[in-house]
Every structure is written in C-alpha cells, then in structure tokens.
C-alpha cells in the first residue's frame, strides 16, 4: 500500500485524530465523481488505516505543492466550475471530500466545548488531500458546510510567504432564491442542517437580530443562509487580501467563462493552456450539466431561471424586501463587477 499516492484517498479519521482511514480509488474516480462522499463513483471496496506517525512519514516523503481551493456558498455553479478546471494530466480536482466536512464537524464539536482544532490534525488532513499524481496541480472544492475551516487553511506561519490560495465563489441573493425554487426538495432536505452548522461556526447571530429559525419560511431561511456565508466571505477577503483570495461571482463566470477560467488559471498557477480553456467553454464541461453529465447550455440555464422568476416573482420580491434591513445593518461586498446582489 503506497499511501503517498492519491490512489489511497483520505476517507476519515478517528475521534483522537491519530488514526486515519484511506479508501482505494483510481484517477478516474476523482474525474467522474461530483462528490467524494457517499455519492462517490464507483464506491471504493478496499479500506486501510494508518497511524498519525505513519501519516507523518508519508507526508515527509511527498513533494506536493499547496493546493488551490474553491470555497463557495450554495447553489452557485461551484461543481460546474470545478469540472471546467479538471484537465488530466495537468490538474487533479477533489470535489467535496467528505473528510473536510468531517474535520469541520470535529472543529464544531471542539468549539462547543471551548476547545480548538489541533493544528497537527489540520496539517495532516490537508497534506494528505494535497497529494498529487506526478506534476498535477491539485484543486480542492470543499462542501460549504466546511467554510469555517477557511482561515485555518489559508493561514501562514509567521515569517513565511503565503502558501495556499483560493477562489471565493458565490452568487447574488436573487439568483440564490431562484435556484432554491428550482430545487425545492433538495433545499428542504439540506438547508436546515447546513444553516444550523453555519450559525454555530459564526458570531452572525450576535450581529443580526432574527426571529427563531423555525418561524422562517424556506426562502427566508435561504436568505439568512446566503447572508451568513457572505458575512464570512467579507471577513476572509479583509483578512487575507488579494494575494491569497480571488473573488468570483457566478454571474461573471456564466457571462464571461473564458475570462473567469483564465483568471483562476493564472491566480492558482494551474498551467492550463489557452486552447484547453477555450475548448472547455466552446465544446467541453461548460456546456454540460455538472451533476447529470448531460448537455446543458447557458441559454437553457437562463430560460429555466426566467421561468422560475416569472412563476415566483412575488415570493422572491417579498423575501428581498424582508432582508433589506439586515443588509443595511451588515452590508455585503459584491464579489466583482457582474454581481448585483439583489437582481
């Protein structure tokens, strides 16, 4: 078993943070899986464990460079973006590895008991996720439920140059509400749990006066969910600056995909060629449904959004109006010139 290879994907760790579980996968598994959790394709059949000391030995022998990260809010084409950047053998993309969600949950539990996530555990997890095949650049797109880990991932030791860089991807509140209405069943299943986790990770409720979450309807919960994440993104941008953070709106990505992909390629140092990115946009991943794998052109996406907006216009406008006092109290900084937060 060669744990220096990404063929042994980090799958988890025990409560002590000293035993790590690995699942045997292939390069194809990474390329075709929209999620590296229970939805991984195909499901791994072989698992092995290693101690923290063994992991340290593996990482000492690895020469992988720091990964680039895509942190995102919900329903903002992050999966589509990740597939557009997936170019074997130049890049290796990890989409929503379960172990980072597990690390965030572990961090949440420690924080509730006035503890802190051990730096060594975080270093081991990130080091194992950043293993690569040959000279591939690694891109990691965590689930947004792990966004509280962003400061720890980006932080740099005193006196050391900045290491990790990230893209912060989100969308306008208006477009989030449209997406929620397109995927109501999925949203109802995920949103309460995700929102509760995000609020635990943040001092948001100390800044914002809200009625009980149970009294809010789905769109109001969605608006709070969006604002809580954008509140965090404001903080991340202020703390780490343009050297480590590239802000990007879904609106700009969909409107100017080649320009957006080129900016990410340059910022993360992925080494992708202009022709590769052009092909991605004109006949590749950009024209496919990121999760279904079927053809899904931008025009179809736009038409569906317009249909939802026409059908639920009153509900959307009501939610935007309800959120206005909160936005005045804690403004959200647009990610780029394409993002109009309320339209």
Positions of predicted regions on the chain:
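PAPS-dependent sulfotransferase catalytic domain
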Residues: 99-113, 147-244, 249-274
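Short, surface-exposed connector motifs at secondary-structure boundaries
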Residues: 130-137, 241-246
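PAPS-dependent sulfotransferases, especially Golgi type II membrane carbohydrate sulfotransferases
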Residues: 1-60, 208-219, 230-247, 254-343
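Short, charged/polar micro-motifs that form catalytic or ligand-binding hotspots
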Residues: 68-75, 139-143, 219, 223, ...
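A structural signal for short, well-ordered beta-strand segments and their strand-loop junctions
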Residues: 69-71, 83-86, 92-96, 139-141, ...
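PAPS-dependent sulfotransferase catalytic core
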Residues: 1-127
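CE4/NodB-like, metal-dependent polysaccharide N-deacetylase domain
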Residues: 124-133, 231-237
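Glycine-rich phosphate-binding loop used to anchor ATP phosphates in small-molecule kinases
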Residues: 132-152
